[in-house]
Amino acid sequence: MQKYKKVIDHLQELMRDPRNIRNIGIIAHVDHGKTTLSDNLLSAAGMISDKMAGEMRALDYHEIEQQRGITIKAANISLYYQRDGKEFAINLVDTPGHIDFTGHVTRSLRVIDGAIVVVDSVEEVMVQTETVTRQALEERVRPLLFINKIDRLIKELKLTPQEIQQKILRIIRDFNGLIEAYGEPEFREKWKVKWDNDSVAFGSALHGWGLTNSIAAKKGIRFSDIVDIYNEDPEGLALRRDIPVHEALLDMVALHVPDPIEAQSYRVERLWRDKQDEELFNALKNCDPNGPLIMGVNAVRIDPHAGIVVTGRVFSGTLREGEDVYLINAKKKQKIQQTSIYMGPYRMRMDEIPAGNIAAVLGLTSASSGETVVADAIKDRVISGFEAIRYVTEPVVTVSVEAKNPQDLPKLIDTLRKLTLQDPNLVMIHNQETGEILLKGTGELHLEISLYEVRKAGLEFDVSEPTVVYRESVRGTSDVVLAKSPNKLNRIWVTASPLNDEVVALIREGRVNERMDSRTLAKVLREEGKMDTEDARNVWTIDEENYNLFINRTVGVQRLDEVREILRQGFMWVMKEGPLAGEPVMGVAIRLVNAMIHEDPAHRGPAQLTPAVRKAIFGAMLSANPVLLEPIYEIQVSTPPELIGSVISLISQKRGKVVGIEERGRISIVKGFIPVRETLGGFSNEMRSMTSGRAFWQTKFSHWEPLPKSLMEQVALEIRRRKGMKEELPKAEEYMDTL
């Protein structure tokens, strides 16, 4: 640790000038070697010993991360590096590779400017490699490539130097294929990786060595030399000594990752919504430490001693202890109590943190991931702040959680709330009437690890078997449906119809929201969403969570503005619990076509109008060919070629479909789609049994799909039974009134 302590003060000095800073992340498919690579960088920085690098997992500071050997949360570290006489302060973010934790990856990408994408040379480019690279490109983060586990090609697969070179060239080609597919035109060509310009390195994180073209030329090393060294020494100790991996990686970073000033000049265009205020926009684009304070929050963590620790990037201005700030999303004024930089699990206090740095802040107790923090003095100039962080996964698996001791219930709810604050892909629903607590996550492992956190708090509870989250939608357009309020003095007429894919995509991607002015909103919906002009002009409410619209198509209705908020709340209630099975509604347009509102406010309050709206929408949806949508995973199985038949057979048995098979030397990759419902419970055991444990697979959320008719009624009744609802499917007529 001595060597490390010496550079702390110097690092802090370097961080005062953004030109010295490089903000980077290491991203990859699960088990391709990110954390082992990070440990090598820590070793070079003097944080851990060389011998421990590769096995210490220093950035995995969760106990369960150490046990499972996977990274769950994103941890931060700052490194000192010198190249050609120039000094760098390199802020490194380690991110998870397991698909269930991509929410943490997405948030990490917001604060970094370059990403080292790690690819296992045996497995090559996999489903998660594609996911994280696409996410990086969407956030305008420059990708670099490290091809890992070359030792396995030599020792296990016994490939010749020529075969290894062919494999590396194929990985580079496939990786550049991702940049071609997902990169923006202005970055596509210049961000493609090339061996010639040192934007690609290969090596072995486990054995601590790495090579770029320049290092190979400088040290006169050829492929055949590496093979010879492994033949003499299976641990490749000479390679660790002569070509340490940290030099290859940090050389790549120093050469190709932009400093925050350069990066923000093109990233802020994509990340910042409010472009009208030129002074703010320019301060952000220029990464101006003297500009107004603007910070983007990417993570919230609960520290057992310090409480809520907010991590984010200072895009403009300087963070100072004691300063009053305003949280744009939470609409709250708060005071910064302490400012620090991260060193793995430790925070090193810095009284001032200028633009371009990643900071840890105490005092922002109302912040959540995606929050925009600004100096209190400029709060009225910021309309909506940073673009919403878009997550590629959705919470599609749910469990019911019940405290064994009723006295523990408040503590259980509080602990789960804190977890959801830290993890945006985790959703808790507490039914006040029944006392039931539901926890939704992206997969079984995600929920298992989240509940492990709760057990660590000393709470005992029972957990149900995992079930799938469904969505309700409609396939047709209803006739106009009338519903009266309970006192019969108010009338609501509505229709229901499906939204087109373009509009759903606009809502999902955050390109339309209620914070936009009505003229801009209508223009985007009409031009990009191909929406009817009158509908686009009259959107009352956007359900950003489930992608639905409430549209006012009434003409000349008296007192409508006075009850608008009540009608809106009724709409949002139904969108959370649809008519078929009380599941969230997705992709539906509800049009209010007429209304009769009583003149006396006492007769038109929420107790009268909310049930009327709910009843009308239920009737309309049930008469518009209602459907249940089920979540579908994309599945990718890595298997020996002789087991392809078994893998295809199992996927087919589970209502899945295979869409492609790719040969990669001695392994084959089977790609397909499979309903999430079919992967719960025994799927892992069945796959292991049919392939004798020789197949490896990963799933990621892909899309929603209507349940087959043969299954829909059965599943709807199952859900209704589980929720204690009436065990028969509702009929539209039950919710329709007549004049």
Swiss-Prot record:
Its main location: cytoplasm. It is found in: Cytoplasm. Residues 19-261 form the tr-type G domain. The keyword Nucleotide-binding applies. The modification Diphthamide is found at residue 603. Pfam families: EFG_C (PF00679), EFG_III (PF14492), EFG_IV (PF03764), GTP_EFTU (PF00009), GTP_EFTU_D2 (PF03144). GO terms for biological process: translational elongation. One of its GO terms (molecular function) is translation elongation factor activity. InterPro entries: EFG_II, EFG_III/V, EFG_V-like, EFTu-like_2, G_TR_CS, P-loop_NTPase, Ribosomal_Su5_D2-typ_SF, Ribsml_uS5_D2-typ_fold_subgr. Keywords: Cytoplasm, Elongation factor, GTP-binding, Nucleotide-binding, Protein biosynthesis. GTP binds at residues 28-35, 94-98, 148-151. HAMAP family: EF_G_EF_2_A (MF_00054_A). Catalyzes the GTP-dependent ribosomal translocation step during translation elongation. During this step, the ribosome changes from the pre-translocational (PRE) to the post-translocational (POST) state as the newly formed A-site-bound peptidyl-tRNA and P-site-bound deacylated tRNA move to the P and E sites, respectively. Catalyzes the coordinated movement of the two tRNA molecules, the mRNA and conformational changes in the ribosome. Belongs to the TRAFAC class translation factor GTPase superfamily. Classic translation factor GTPase family. EF-G/EF-2 subfamily. NCBIfam families: aEF-2, small_GTP. This is Elongation factor 2. It comes from Korarchaeum cryptofilum (strain OPF8). The lineage of its organism: Archaea, Thermoproteota, Candidatus Korarchaeia, Candidatus Korarchaeales, Candidatus Korarchaeaceae. The gene is fusA.
